[in-house]
Amino acid sequence: MAERILLVEDEEKLARMVELELRYEGYEVEKAFDGRTGLERALTGEFDLILLDIMLPALSGMEVLRRLRKERQTPVILLTARDAVVDKVSGLDAGADDYVTKPFAIEELL
């Protein structure tokens, strides 16, 4: 059975590109386009990895991560355009397993 990835990303073109690359590599991908939906799916579904944008509508990625960590320990990689050291430290302190800045090569996620 393929590993399942939840991709929470509000930029539809980027989400589609990442989804296609991951599916090509054999992963099963479910998408959410806002933080609230992403959190709901993360808490109700079974995922091997969550790729989570920080700047999302409805609920920020950081808030999604904080709430998620109260109930689940699913690995989370934050995807963001924020590249300041303070942002990376904040993300990792909040419970992210990794922090990848945009733009990125798909190989950084595999």
Where are these regions (language model features)?
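N-terminal/domain-start alpha-helical segments
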Residues: M1-L110
